[in-house]
Amino acid sequence: MRPLQSYKAFEDHMAQEPVEDTDPSTLSFNTSDKYPVQDTELPKAEECNTITLNCPPNSDMKNQGEENGFPDSTGDPLPEISKDNSCKENCTCSSCLLRAPTISDLLNDQDLLDVIRIKLDPCHPTVKNWRNFASKWGMSYDELCFLEQRPQSPTLEFLLRNSQRTVGQLMELCRLYHRADVEKVLRRWVDEEWPKRERGDPSRHF
């Protein structure tokens, strides 16, 4: 009889205990405040735009990658890959301050002009001279013949007619017609004599 009395006492105790309601329809709305339900639906278009705008900038992502110990492959190029020996904009080095000399500047140096005239005036069957240079820069055959008949140096006449061109363009003609001797003279003048002349005359910069 004792086990039966114990079982009845257990039933009475269970009847007094509150029974948990497991019906989902009877869940209290207050539960969502304590345990928010995760929204698993796809975001709408407006939400996508908001998410995109709220994304951290690339700099933050880069810093995050560096903090994690991984190099950033999309960052700026390494210094070794960048161009070497290139001057920046508004550079104040001596090479950038000097303007490119023109043939007009070359004509003011009588010593240099005499050397070029001696090298380009003579006519040789296998050596390119002033005629080839002048023809390349658009001088007609009649003009070439006319300059040959004049007592003045034809090389000087050719240079006077192209005085607005740069000395660099003249050196390109020397390379084109394999006149390395003339190019060497011009190169030495540009590298050594021209900087002295340009710095010695400040009025050229104004």
UniProtKB/Swiss-Prot annotation:
Residues 1-36, 52-77 are annotated as: Disordered. It holds the Pfam family Death. Residues 24-33, 52-62 have a biased composition (Polar residues). Its main location: cytoplasm. It is found in: Cytoplasm. One of its GO terms (biological process) is signal transduction. Adapter protein that interacts with EDAR DEATH domain and couples the receptor to EDA signaling pathway during morphogenesis of ectodermal organs. Mediates the activation of NF-kappa-B. Self-associates and binds to EDAR, TRAF1, TRAF2 and TRAF3. PANTHER family: ECTODYSPLASIN-A RECEPTOR-ASSOCIATED ADAPTER PROTEIN (PTHR28469:SF1). This is Ectodysplasin-A receptor-associated adapter protein.
